[in-house]
């Protein structure tokens, strides 16, 4: 019977310890080879938590699927911070250009609840609120209103 293991690992730095080792060890496969493969596939997401799905079939063949990091991790990497604000409504820790928000939305579009780029960008900007990041030097809620009013349509269509 095929087994599927879903884990969140640091990009490019997964280890044979928890959560991967204990999940794969009983399946009788080479955990080190799997970890090395995961590290190669997640190297571009260095410093971010990356969702990884490991499927092991009856013949012990391993298939590794790498997801896209959470929106929060992408926003923080783009801004260059390691942690979000402890008090996001009063302490601002960085600024995200609207173009970067659009880029993140395009990356995450398949995983989001949104069907359109405009609403996906709004989701990314909503994440900025909870992390304590401004967008184009303004409060995220001001940008959300401007997007709804159509002021950023040219950026969204580019």
From Swiss-Prot:
Any Pfam family hit: Ribosomal_L11
Keyword Zinc appears in the UniProt entry: no
Q: Classify the source by domain of life.
A: Archaea
| Keyword annotations from UniProtKB, A to Z | Ribonucleoprotein, Ribosomal protein, RNA-binding, rRNA-binding
Q: Which GO terms describe its biological process?
A: translation
Show the GO cellular component annotation of the record.
large ribosomal subunit
GO MF annotation terms? large ribosomal subunit rRNA binding; structural constituent of ribosome
> What is the role of this chain?
Forms part of the ribosomal stalk which helps the ribosome interact with GTP-bound translation factors.
The similarity comment for this entry is: Belongs to the universal ribosomal protein uL11 family.
Q: How does it assemble?
A: Part of the ribosomal stalk of the 50S ribosomal subunit. Interacts with L10 and the large rRNA to form the base of the stalk. L10 forms an elongated spine to which L12 dimers bind in a sequential fashion forming a multimeric L10(L12)X complex.
Name of this protein: Large ribosomal subunit protein uL11
The organism's taxonomy opens as: Archaea, Methanobacteriati, Methanobacteriota, Stenosarchaea group, Methanomicrobia
